[in-house]
Curated annotation (Swiss-Prot):
<comment type="subunit">
    <text>The glycine cleavage system is composed of four proteins: P, T, L and H.</text>
</comment>
<keyword id="KW-0560">Oxidoreductase</keyword>
<dbReference type="InterPro" id="IPR049315">
    <property type="entry name" value="GDC-P_N"/>
</dbReference>
<dbReference type="GO" id="GO:0030170">
    <property type="term" value="F:pyridoxal phosphate binding"/>
</dbReference>
<dbReference type="InterPro" id="IPR015421">
    <property type="entry name" value="PyrdxlP-dep_Trfase_major"/>
</dbReference>
<dbReference type="Pfam" id="PF21478">
    <property type="entry name" value="GcvP2_C"/>
</dbReference>
<dbReference type="InterPro" id="IPR015422">
    <property type="entry name" value="PyrdxlP-dep_Trfase_small"/>
</dbReference>
<comment type="similarity">
    <text>Belongs to the GcvP family.</text>
</comment>
<dbReference type="InterPro" id="IPR003437">
    <property type="entry name" value="GcvP"/>
</dbReference>
<dbReference type="GO" id="GO:0019464">
    <property type="term" value="P:glycine decarboxylation via glycine cleavage system"/>
</dbReference>
<dbReference type="InterPro" id="IPR020581">
    <property type="entry name" value="GDC_P"/>
</dbReference>
<dbReference type="Pfam" id="PF02347">
    <property type="entry name" value="GDC-P"/>
</dbReference>
<dbReference type="InterPro" id="IPR015424">
    <property type="entry name" value="PyrdxlP-dep_Trfase"/>
</dbReference>
<dbReference type="GO" id="GO:0016594">
    <property type="term" value="F:glycine binding"/>
</dbReference>
<comment type="function">
    <text>The glycine cleavage system catalyzes the degradation of glycine. The P protein binds the alpha-amino group of glycine through its pyridoxal phosphate cofactor; CO(2) is released and the remaining methylamine moiety is then transferred to the lipoamide cofactor of the H protein.</text>
</comment>
<dbReference type="InterPro" id="IPR049316">
    <property type="entry name" value="GDC-P_C"/>
</dbReference>
<protein>
    <recommendedName>
        <fullName>Glycine dehydrogenase (decarboxylating)</fullName>
        <ecNumber>1.4.4.2</ecNumber>
    </recommendedName>
</protein>
Amino acid sequence: MMTTALTPFSARHIGPGVNDVRAMLAVIGVPSVETLISQAVPQSIRLDLPLTLPAPASEAEALAELSAIMAKNTVLKSFIGAGYHGVHVPPVIQRNLFENPAWYTAYTPYQAEISQGRLEMLFNFQTLVTELTGLPVASASLLDEATAVAEAVGIALRHHRDKRTKVAFAGTPHPQTLDVVRTRAEPLGIEIDGETIDDNTAALLVSWPDTLGVYGDHKAAIDKARAAGALVVFIADPLGLTLTDAPAKLGADIAVGPMQRFGVPMGFGGPHAAYCAVSDRLTRLMPGRLVGQSTDSKGRPGYRLALQTREQHIRRDKATSNICTAQALLANMATAYAIWHGPAGLQAIAGRIHALANRLASGLKAAGVSVLGASRFDTVTVEAKGKAAEIAEAAEKTGRLLRVLDADHVGIAFDETSTDADLDAIASLFGAKAAPSADSTVPGKPRGKEFLTQPVFNENKSETDMMRLLRRLADKDLALDRSMIPLGSCTMKLNAAAEMMPVSWPSIADLHPFAPASHSAGYRAMIGELEGWLSEITGFDAVSLQPNAGSQGEYAGLLAIRAYHRSRGEGHRTVCLIPSSAHGTNPASAAMAGMSVVVVRCLEDGNIDMDDMRAKANEHSKNLAALMFTYPSTHGVYEEGARHLCALIHEHGGQVYFDGANLNALVALARPADIGADVCHMNLHKTFCIPHGGGGPGVGPIGVKAHLKPYLPGHVTEGSAHAVSAAPFGSASILPITWMYIRMMGAAGLKQATETAIISANYVATRLAPHFPLLYKGRHDRIAHECILDTRVLKESAGISVDDIAKRLIDYGFHAPTMSFPVAGTLMVEPTESEPKRELDRFCEAMIAIAGEAAKVARGDWPLADNPLVNAPHTAAETLAGQWTHPYSRLEAAYPAGDADTAAKYWPPVSRIDNVAGDRNLVCSCPPLSDYLGAAE
């Protein structure tokens, strides 16, 4: 279809054109779109009227409208600190990583062979963290500082097998951190017990420095905690760690903190990565992803996700955490910042910040003004003697924001954007002059120069080198900028450039989340509109945008249900019914919310076993808290009895939690609240176009009925509590992506997108059914937006496994569909509405060709031990090897689709990765250069 500047955005977002859709419907065997939708989607849930949303805007109109809204923000220079700091984003990183679709459109690196670039960068992130903390193992990022501290508490509880129930503090953490920890602790019966340490203490949380900016003397508390068997958790500023001793040397078992000030804008609260590092004995208790080094089938080094058996998609309610999506893109950005500056540069930045803080403190003291603490990194807390608000108001008039702690104290946090002019202006507010110089006040022995000695942190200081490093890593990966990613239950749709552009605007990127409310008028207007649109789309009465991942949305929704029952004097309602086919985050979230999980069987056709559901609901009627279910189901079909299911749970006094993972099959056709749900989370990084970022960021807002609205997450800075994320609006700076998508699509465009997603899935299913039976089908043999291909037929006929198929798809230039979920040995395919018909056809032809290759193995044309399927993927080095001994040709290996004359070939950098070896010999960070030098001597 020819497009022009007047073409509606929906026609650019949706891949198949009018003629394509007509051809696809013919293959499916229906005369019209409406016929297919009426066959697939039960009439009982269909919307009677169109959604009430603004008429669609063009890209230019939407950008102009959003720009005008965000211009209402007042972005002053922030000295608020409290975990959020101004940064200079290196342009080479902003342009070549943050704004590069090769980086931001990739999926979580489950398929190691096509993810080596971002796995290598995350491995470098882990190395960075282990070097800063002195602890041997670090994860590949968590969601933010507050949730990272809560996860650290979880590690301590699991370490003590849930037999200890107290958490103590040494130094005061940031208020938002304490609030999130309290939120996590309360459902589990954990007591936040101040400074008291005894034999029931699971963890001591050491703030390094504390929220006042002070490095306290915590040696006695640490010694007491260790004597009592409690784990010591350091909450440490990573930039400050370039100047101080590593937490491990100070007694830490765990260290956590935010990586935001490593080149990631504040963004009104996020997203940014947090880090988590642990001692060796705690490795298997760590939350989130862990990248490890292994080897491929040829003995070459390669990276992979390690120890996945501890994660939610494997262990479910027994998992170490409900974390699924983390902050991979932002962790990669922070790593690039460390690579760009190197250890000397990081120390220079930290040293300059430290000097500014000490010069202010010295100058104030000389003028007779009291400051708190003798040892600090970047923050000076000043005694204002009742004039804190007055001083902050005077600072604001100069274009600077200070932190008012109470009527008598003001906090001033310096960062890499702070200047001598700022220092002088702030000192003058107190009638003082900054000292011309000041001695370092970091505690203990200063960190030396011997850290981050690995070559990657020392060899990329020119922009040419850095640009090429980022390009080299991106070229190793397969993202949406290269080809379709048909992952079922993941909705890898287009992340349009117009949606992404605003994220880099200063009016969006540079605002502190705790700036005065009047300064965030633009953000609050945009957020208010977005909440209203999401309420209209889902049918709920209220929406919270605070949860910064789908897993956190689940948790927030279950906490709302829990609080509702308790408000009615029914705190005994703690049983959560969950179908056996549910996403792994569901049972993990229920366990975190203090609920006990009761699994409900599914039938062979994939539907929930309603007899078992009724029996379980009857059995647990008095204690029933909730049902968690996904719709359409994780089997890719619209179950007929959704309304009856919700009514059944309500009859027994329970609430219905609707998992919105598959909302892309419902938008503008049906609404969860109308079906009977009480709460639902929405993955904005699926249905609403926020990119996956190679494993994050994500946003998982929840919608609730009116009776649950009082129990939505609050925030200490907004006069409430029970937060689930560090910032009031979570990952606020990426919310404009979803705002832009909805604004440009309009109600009709959103409906067309949903219909096209269903058409594309049924088209792929119809084409592939003769070769791979569809495991589940709904009425009229239709599916929703995804299908499960029973690839076990190739295992039975030829010995070819689902792994072999997935790896062979790499040779065809595709990321594999979702493997072995929800059924082992199968592939779940979700094409989304964004893929053009020619790409769908290319995928179908690849799958059909693979079935043909398996037939050759079955006939004996190729031996099972040596064929292009079991040897896949094929690297360029293997294909060009001087001696070729395989029974198939080099062209069959590398260009199975017969496209050797094209320039679009994707070459995997490694052959098949050995997963077992990687877990048996866990290597999760790069050794320092001294290890190599020592080995060579």
